[in-house]
């Protein structure tokens, strides 16, 4: 799936126009005619689609040339249009809190640069009030990454620091991020009964005063972009959330989030919470509403998407889903869900993430944290674009869209049509014959039948059959009927448990 900004040659849509666009996509994918009604900014739309069509139909589509889109001006409390979803990455703060996932200052700086290439809207890079080293690291990122402007698009990442509702934390945050072109602070406070009673030991009124006074103090220091985070919002009373959010908005907050801190909510439940707060909080439509979900019950991605469907327009995520306990909503899953299905079942929501940077970013985070993803991890796992079943292999060899809804190239994996095929006991004749051809062997039916029979015997002894095994099977078969057995090297895609060896 082409991950590019597209517009019809000679035609620039204007703000508010509705146009029909088509695009040619790899291996049989094509973007169906789609009426797009969200505003344009003298430019084009970041399009993607997961609906397969025939090759014949695909060739009829207009091949649109990629263009570069200027990013709209960043306004803390307002989005460029109602369907735009900001991506707030917290890999370097919440993600680093994953047990065993601590990063060195140079590693945090490198990941921040990688996140900028990914084009996250906001990166939360640390907790300056927690230690001198953390303060200096956040400051370094603000001075460097926070001032690096993409000349073509005008993109500049927002650099965010987190703080408790304490003046010393807020002062430390300001001193650390004030060097960035777009500094931001996230001030959090607990809002659930259990947290207020046992952790804060404060009444609801005291918590509201603590939050609002902290927002006003942050604004007095120079922060223009101030977000209030409701810790344990998923277990908080709805009416109280409406009240504290409303007061925060009056105090000058430009964004608010309601965090499912302990990962207890179900998608329908969390979506309904967001919907209720959007409908009953004074001033909520004048700021950005954000969602922050943890994965204790395995539904962080689903909850985040439910929040977007309910009206949230900022998602807080981490690369590979790393974070406290079972982790956070994974950036790659949320972004690709929005990219793949946003136009079809979510009223056209979209992000500006450069998804081609996803795999490289995932690998870097894995290597630096030592937290490797499981092979079947969606989007970035080693098995994501690999097939062993004979039926699936046959389909993939005919047209990849038969069993893959995403293009590997779209997330930064470069593959050929025949790669992604793993030979084993479930593999069929088509896959084995095709692999032999890639290795340079042109065999008649009799010879291939003999080799395939011995291939089947070999699969009873080995889980996976390598190219060397196939060559040995041919060589020991006698007359090699090669078109030279030319020793042609293969660029096949063979997965291993650690993703660092995958691409």
From Swiss-Prot:
Q: What biological processes does GO assign it?
A: L-leucine biosynthetic process
User: Which reaction equation describes what this protein catalyses?
Assistant: 4-methylsulfanyl-2-oxobutanoate + acetyl-CoA + H2O = 2-(2-methylsulfanyl)ethylmalate + CoA + H(+)
Stated EC number for the protein is: 2.3.3.17
Subcellular location(s): the record lists: Plastid, Chloroplast
Task: Tell me the enzyme class.
Answer: transferase
Q: Give the record's free-text account of how this protein's activity is regulated.
A: Inhibited by EDTA, Mg(2+), Ca(2+), Cu(2+) and Zn(2+).
Q: In which pathway does it act?
A: Secondary metabolite biosynthesis
> Assembly and interactions?
Monomer.
Q: Which protein is depicted?
A: Methylthioalkylmalate synthase 1-2, chloroplastic
Q: Which gene encodes it?
A: MAM1-2
